[in-house]
Amino acid sequence: MEFLTHSLLPLHEVCALQQRLSAPNLPWRDGRLTAGDQAALVKKNYQLDPNAELSLAISNCISTALTSDPLVKSFSLVRKVHSLLVSRSSAGESYGWHVDNPFSRNGRRDLSFTCFLSDEDSYEGGSLMIQTGGEDTKEFRLPPGQVVLYPSSTLHCVTPVLSGDRYVCVGWIESYVKAADDRSMLFNIDAGARGLLARHGRSDELDLIFQSYTNAVRRLSS
């Protein structure tokens, strides 16, 4: 399983963030300032100053939600959430095909995530497209408060916004397990074992599965 979409933030928190994002005179900066040389050529959006009070509040809210969510923790084996950015894309703005840098000064980038903050009917366009292999792509345009996680090694883009304003928070996860295939395998084992536990209760055989899962994480961790 390469991608995870999940309801991360409750509606009341999203509504409060939306109200604050609509305030005038927020310190928006050219999004190219945080892109690598190649990505900057295809990036056209704006990002909230990372040191602004609202940016820090949104980053802390989403980081806390990610690191405390059982499904996200199982999927990503999160060691660290870092380098969060609040992004705004208006009509005519987009982010062309690119791959994220493998690391930043804050940590390795094993998984990327986008948490959607705008109501779906408040803007047109602005889909996140992720290449899944060859010419196949997956499209993500999620309700506010939902997040998509995906390997940072994938090519992805944001299609042009046709109208309205698209607000998202993006960031990266350094995982205990670097390889996406290994994380996917471990996630499936964990999900299967927990499903058996919920349906049939504890057993000696299930203990062996959990033991093997734990030792596999230990062996594959970096």
Curated annotation (Swiss-Prot):
Binds 1 Fe(2+) ion per subunit. Fe cation binds at H98, D100, H156. Keywords: Dioxygenase, Iron, Metal-binding, Oxidoreductase, Vitamin C. InterPro entries: Oxoglu/Fe-dep_dioxygenase_dom (IPR005123), PKHD_hydroxylase (IPR023550), Pro_4_hyd_alph (IPR006620), Pro_4_hyd_alph_FE2OG_OXY (IPR044862). Residues 80-175 form the Fe2OG dioxygenase domain. Its EC number is 1.14.11.-. SUPFAM superfamilies: Clavaminate synthase-like. Its cofactor is Fe(2+); L-ascorbate. GO terms for molecular function: 2-oxoglutarate-dependent dioxygenase activity; iron ion binding; L-ascorbic acid binding. GO terms for biological process: DNA damage response; intracellular iron ion homeostasis. It is an enzyme of class 1 (oxidoreductase). 2-oxoglutarate binds at R166. NCBIfam families: PRK05467.1-3. HAMAP family: Hydroxyl_YbiX (MF_00657). This is PKHD-type hydroxylase Syncc9605_1577.
